[in-house]
């Protein structure tokens, strides 16, 4: 099992993701190598896919959008995202998707 979810000492999570923009619908699509694949309905134009990714993850993780930040991969399909949260069990819930 790939460890695409990394938990820091402060409780925040770093997610390793592979993004497929321009998909029919937004959602998790299983593991893609060492990363979780997420399909986004938003096109990869003017940062729309990045904004949609942050909004999707904020909704899934039940945190404000401001708690989700793109760490790397602004113009790439391979991205690392940080989720600042204190929600117990969130890392396990995310790992269960893959």
Swiss-Prot record:
One of its GO terms (cellular component) is cytoplasm. It holds the Pfam family DUF167. SUPFAM superfamilies: YggU-like. It comes from the Bacteria. HAMAP family: UPF0235 (MF_00634). Belongs to the UPF0235 family. This is UPF0235 protein azo3464. It comes from Azoarcus sp. (strain BH72). The lineage of its organism: Bacteria, Pseudomonadati, Pseudomonadota, Betaproteobacteria, Rhodocyclales.
């Amino acid at each position: 099992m790939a460890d695409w979810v990394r938990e820091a000492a402060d409780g925040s999570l770093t997610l390793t993701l592979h993004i497929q923009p321009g998909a029919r619908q937004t959602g998790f699509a299983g593991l893609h190598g060492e990363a979780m694949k997420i399909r986004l309905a938003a096109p990869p134009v003017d940062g729309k896919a990045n904004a949609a990714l942050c909004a999707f993850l904020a909704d899934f993780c039940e945190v404000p959008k401001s708690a989700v930040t793109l760490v790397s991969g602004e113009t790439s399909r391979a991205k690392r995202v940080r989720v600042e949260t204190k929600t117990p069990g969130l890392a396990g819930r995310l790992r269960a998707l893959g």
